[in-house]
């Protein structure tokens, strides 16, 4: 990756030079109209922060290991939209820093994403949760899908379970999707839905969590419980995604 100057960063506008380079080098053309109305500045000027393109490659590989389950694309690999790479996957997973033990970890621990309807929210969520559970280098990872009700939890869980169940790569890796959880028996890594604080209190130590459709959550108790539970993990990620026009 080429060296980046402060003036480069100032001219980059919607994308950091690092992410812009990543998209160009991987063939993603990001239309101007997809630029978010608001976004958190990336940590390019922060001491110790650096961009690791290989980490973004791994997330995208996890997405491509999943399969469409409906319509004309059924059975074909998922593919991220350029805007998903530029404004979500590359910034969240590409920026890293060394922790107190000298280990390289993600810069971001929390993400809030708002997108209009019919813009691949389910696909994006599925890819990130599968990556966190089974490809992030975290043995025995617990990934929880938080929802405001059991019905909403199923809406978050079922598309991920279907995409995993249709994936030959997931099957080869020993990952199985069941009615109430997706699990890798070799180390107990798991994805499962939760719909109340009580669901999260017994033996949970989440490496990541998804809060889908945040606007339907009655309160923040469940999310706060999940945030507290991530304390023992080296690089947890809380991912909140909701419909922008809801």
Predicted feature descriptions by range:
Residues 2-246:
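Phosphate/NTP-binding elements of NTP-utilizing enzymes
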